[in-house]
Regions:
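Cap/insert and terminal regions of metallo-dependent hydrolase folds
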Residues: 44-133
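Core dinuclear metal-dependent hydrolase active-site scaffold
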Residues: 1-50, 54-55, 134-145
Length: 145
């Protein structure tokens, strides 16, 4: 991947992701906080891959593609999407603090997503299903000079 650096010491790193049409993951670092955006990813076995674990290591938030349920995934293998369970496994391996599941299947209604979020929170208390219009804020932490 590539890295963009900005005068205010913000950095954006990229990582190619496994997807039939190609995709890119992003790691945003600024003022001691890290957020990673991992969309359009076909998870592989073994999971999670070492390069992705390094990429999201110690992130404050990982925003992850949770298009399918574990039950749906075998029928949709090769479509370039993943499951919330794989997002949890990635976050655990990388010591990420929170997980937002997005890129949701259009056939999954609000009731389904609420039920899934209950399972998600049971697996990782700081995880949630992202919602339209939702905004999150992180306070800056002291950075080394």
């Amino acid at each position: 991947g590539e890295t963009l650096r900005f005068p205010d010491r913000a950095a954006v790193d990229t990582l190619p992701l496994q997807h039939p049409n190609g995709a890119t993951g992003y790691r945003f670092a600024h003022k001691g906080r890290i957020a990673c955006y991992i969309s359009d990813i076909e998870h592989s076995e073994p999971w999670p891959p070492a390069d992705l674990v390094r990429f999201v290591r110690d992130a404050d938030l990982v925003i992850y593609d949770g298009m399918f349920s574990e039950e749906e995934y075998p029928r949709c293998r090769g479509w370039g999407h993943s499951t919330w369970e794989k997002g949890v496994a990635l976050c655990r391996a990388a010591n990420a603090k929170a997980l937002a599941i997005f890129h949701l299947h259009p056939a999954h209604d609000d009731a389904y997503l609420l039920a899934s979020e209950g399972e998600l929170k049971a697996a990782m208390a700081s995880a949630f299903v992202a919602r339209e219009g939702q905004a999150l804020a992180f306070s800056a932490v002291n950075e080394p000079a």
